[in-house]
Amino acid sequence: EDVKYQWQDKAYKATKAFSKESEKLGFFGINMASTGCGKTIANARIMYALSDERDGCRFSVALGLRTLTMQTGDAYRALLKLGDDELAVLIGSNAVKLLHQLDKDEKKNTASANGSESIQDDYEHLFVSYEGQIYDGRLKRWLSSSPKLEQLVSAPVLVSTIDHLMPATESQRGGKQIAPMLRLLTSDLVLDEPDDFGLEDLPALCRIVNWAGMLGSRVLLSSATLPPGL
């Protein structure tokens, strides 16, 4: 076993020790480690340690950049062996996915160079890599007209840009805040690389962390260079 990653085992054991207490008292953690030390996988292990094995593990990873979202999804598929019925990767459009594929094949940062992080899309234009579904019931019937929102809510592990969860803290026309709110209500939250955001984004980040905590989510911040201001 690589010595560089042994800290993950320590983090898992330390978190597991108070997983029961976190169900009632909540959890707010910070995972700080240098780039290349395995924070992405450690985040998943920490959230798994907090979860109840009988109920299963459900968590959302929110990032600031779409290219990092795709890379995180790839890491979870490859290293955690998560299938398409367990992991949902939510990005802006098929175009971003194709750019990411070019990046993997050609080892170039094509998606970032084209500024795909700034694309604004509605849920109708999202590409969701996920094949699971909600069991029959009222929620499934309510979401039947929007399959992509159903995927957003139902996936055990969700990796997405944070803008897809942010409507949970805002009043949206047509009830568009309901699906992100349901996601936070039924899963824990990982904010990955929050330092990618500017200071002007801090109020929005604080709102989603506060709202997630009020809904019962356990929250983890993960970063290699988290500034004191955050």
Report each predicted region and the residues it spans:
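N-terminal helicase ATP-binding lobe
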Residues: E1-L230
